[in-house]
Amino acid sequence: MTTPTEFQFTDYQPYDFANRRHIGPSPAEMAEMLKVIGYNSLEGLIDATLPPAIRQKAPLVWGAPMTEREALDKLRETANKNKVLVSLIGQGYYGTITPPVIQRNILENPAWYTAYTPYQPEISQGRLEALLNYQTMVCDLTGLDIANASLLDEATAAAEGMAMAERVAKSKAKAFFVDADCHPQTIALIRTRAEPLGWSVIVGNPFTDLDPVDVFGAIFQYPGTHGHVHDFTGLIARLHQAGAISVVAADILALTLLKSPGEMGADIAVGSSQRFGVPVGYGGPHAAFMAVRDAIKRAMPGRLVGVSVDARGNRAYRLSLQTREQHIRREKATSNICTAQVLLAVMASMYAVFHGPDGIKAIAQQVHQKAVLMAKGLEKLGYKVEPESFFDTITVDVGHMQGLILRAAVAEGVNLRKVGETKIGMSLDERTRPATLEAVWRAFGGNFTIADFEPSYRLPKALLRTSEYLSHPIFHMNRAESEMTRYIRRLSDRDLALDRAMIPLGSCTMKLNATAEMLPITWPEFSDIHPFVPADQALGYREMLDDLTEKLCAVTGYDAFSMQPNSGAQGEYAGLLTIRNYHIANGEGHRDVCLIPTSAHGTNPASAQMVGMKVVVVKVRENGDIDMEDFRAKAEEHAANLSCCMITYPSTHGVFEETVKEICELVHKHGGQVYLDGANMNAMVGLSRPGDIGSDVSHLNLHKTFCIPHGGGGPGMGPIGVKAHLAPHLPGHPETDGRPGAVSAAPFGSASILPISWSYCLMMGGEGLTQATKVAILNANYIATRLKGAYNVLYKSKTGRVAHECIIDTRPLVDSSGVTVDDVAKRLIDCGFHAPTMSWPVAGTLMIEPTESETKAELDRFCEAMLAIREEARAIEDGRMDKTNNPLKNAPHTVEDLVGEWDRPYSREQACFPPGAFRVDKYWSPVNRVDNVYGDRNLICTCPPVESYAEAAE
């Protein structure tokens, strides 16, 4: 031990978020990794990876990076500029109570929020069960046969319902009827969706204005946006007689007291599960739902959880009917829906489990009683309350007093809804207190208390619900919080999320979702703001949105952004609509051809189809680059009608193509616009800007590049950036600027998760974001280098480099050993890893994206696992292992395998503890390999009957 002669200060920064917390490898580890790859410096690797022509000229510079504490202080200062009033605005957004056991153990739990979409069912059984509970809940309450596992928001679900109605209707009409009592944002989104497809939208009173022979479908709001509760049974019957489809947009809480849409004969029901314990959050995120009749289930959009069996015959859950989806069907898909709202659907399903049918019914009754009491007080003041029958929403005509009363209510701490120029609306909810009613009465000039009135009900007797719901045992479990906590824990333990291991999914960017970034989303100043409050009550939100927009413009080289799209797919849709509207404004509405490479994300052609574009497919060369000869020929062939091209950069093959500028120039030469898919932006931030390359519009996946967690399949955010000439054509919204083109129910999409991306930017700074990009490229090249002797890295640049991801070819194993890409993926589960992206963009391959957040130790563990798998395949090739009875074909191995009778020609240790697997903290798959074919042939998409649990236990 040495004794220092004088005190020395250290330059170590313990709270340097970018270099100590977000970026995985240490400087010493980076040096080791660079040596393996063959470079002396990180800059040397970056120079070899990115073509000089696409490098941005100036560094990404803004204020110095903040520590976690400084960023949280900044977020708190900003949040405090929002005013949290009691909002009775309604219009699809309501106060609700998130049970603390759900907030702490799901919303704030990385085991739930860092998981990926459950494409690998064996390691997703927990959230698949929670989603099956959600589907069962929705089916029960809507009275329909089958429900999906969530959509983006109620208005989007309504637009999807219209599109589905057109697909399945026997009627050949090209018009869709919309109940004028639908929420305004729903009407706006339906108009947006219908116009490019050539469908006319008729808005009116369904009882006087609907002629079923003129439409392919109709949507009714139940209860209506202004409170009316109507029986649509007769109208639905008339629609069916005309070969048209009925859609009912229903309030999920009201359905506990009211006759279900299914009992009215509805074909499709849509709505939001927000009021089942999910905060309003200035518009989102919230899980929408869709339920349909069994006969039309294959035309339903979105993901669908079903029941199957595993290799032992035990019950297992999986995503069913995936051939409907965009990643397989592309432009023929039912929708471009990709990321949905899984985390929020899980919360809503747990709200139903937490309360059970009795609890939810009691909440609904209490909400209704509050609304009746509110009406009685207003009637005592001499106002006529409309409608006569209602659930939670009433409207009063106050004439010229509207503004005065609205301001008086705000002074009392309450937001009411402005309806037209003379009316005021209000929607009561679970959080409404007696003091709130009395405050509203004072705003109207009253001075009495809630004790002055007797509770009663004003629901129409003919529509009172008599059918059961939530009858499955899962909704009748013991209400003790200890049981609820353990149930949530049991489900999360079945899943593999980022809190356990790296998830190296190519094109998915499963990077760190730092705890400091997540904390603010549950602050009331962000979570309890209604999306339609007056602007002066959301100044903090606006400040954050403005600064985040400025930062994203700096990152991308674009001039303007819209934060409205609430998923990447919605961003594509919004961007293509923007291009379409630009052409129309220039008198070139005939431009409807979209050039898309065969390697594109499946959402690209699906989104193009949704805006009425004709998809022309461009070939890709053997090296993964776009075939410029074919691209040039098709651009010239369709020059007169060319609307745009859609490209991904770096390419979906994980390489920076050198012809990207030439592509942009060629499209512009022929009058088109360039849409650059921002899914791979994690390889560009700080190094290259789409707007400088020649792109006109991009969406950014904030749930990839900018740290919003994937949530097991949502939420996400897909804001779009555009060059100045496209800015006037960005989406509008009826509640803000009144312009057309809304693509999400709320003006700023899922606004309450934007603090995550903003705090990430604040803590990283421009220099940190740039370093993150460089390390993402380093990590991918390190893996590619370590694996290249065992596997062929399919695509590389001229310099032999990959971008932020690499594709390894497992196809040769099929011929040499019979080992498929599925076998490799399932064997990785035994090693404690989520498989990389399988069979995309090339069948039989694995696309690996490690991100910048993974340490060298974790990268090495993954490489050891992949190398060991190759050795197992080699043992099959050499005859040292059986070709069908081996660890790869039998993977994943479960505890049941370990303790059961062992008759396999390899050891238990080899099966369960391959290289890469932890011994002490090993992840065990809860099921063996899931039978996909069985699940689709025997489709069950609600909770199995209780008898099946007994059978499974035998």
Curated annotation (Swiss-Prot):
On whether Lipid metabolism is a keyword of this UniProt record, the answer is: no
Query: Which GO biological process annotations does it have?
Result: glycine decarboxylation via glycine cleavage system
Named from the GO MF annotations, one term is: glycine binding
Q: Which positions carry N6-(pyridoxal phosphate)lysine?
A: 704
Keywords assigned: Oxidoreductase, Pyridoxal phosphate
What's the catalysed reaction? N(6)-[(R)-lipoyl]-L-lysyl-[glycine-cleavage complex H protein] + glycine + H(+) = N(6)-[(R)-S(8)-aminomethyldihydrolipoyl]-L-lysyl-[glycine-cleavage complex H protein] + CO2
Look up the EC number in the record and give it. 1.4.4.2
In this record, what's one Pfam family?
Answer: GDC-P
Instruction: Show the InterPro entries listed in the entry.
Output: GcvP, GDC-P_C, GDC-P_N, GDC_P, PyrdxlP-dep_Trfase, PyrdxlP-dep_Trfase_major, PyrdxlP-dep_Trfase_small
Enzyme class name: oxidoreductase
The UniProt entry's GO CC annotations, sorted and at most eight, read: cytosol; glycine cleavage complex
Query: How is the quaternary structure described?
Result: The glycine cleavage system is composed of four proteins: P, T, L and H.
The record's similarity note reads: Belongs to the GcvP family.
Which purpose does this protein serve, as stated in its record? Answer: The glycine cleavage system catalyzes the degradation of glycine. The P protein binds the alpha-amino group of glycine through its pyridoxal phosphate cofactor; CO(2) is released and the remaining methylamine moiety is then transferred to the lipoamide cofactor of the H protein.
Query: What's the name of the protein?
Result: Glycine dehydrogenase (decarboxylating)
Which species does this protein come from?
Answer: Rhizobium etli (strain ATCC 51251 / DSM 11541 / JCM 21823 / NBRC 15573 / CFN 42)
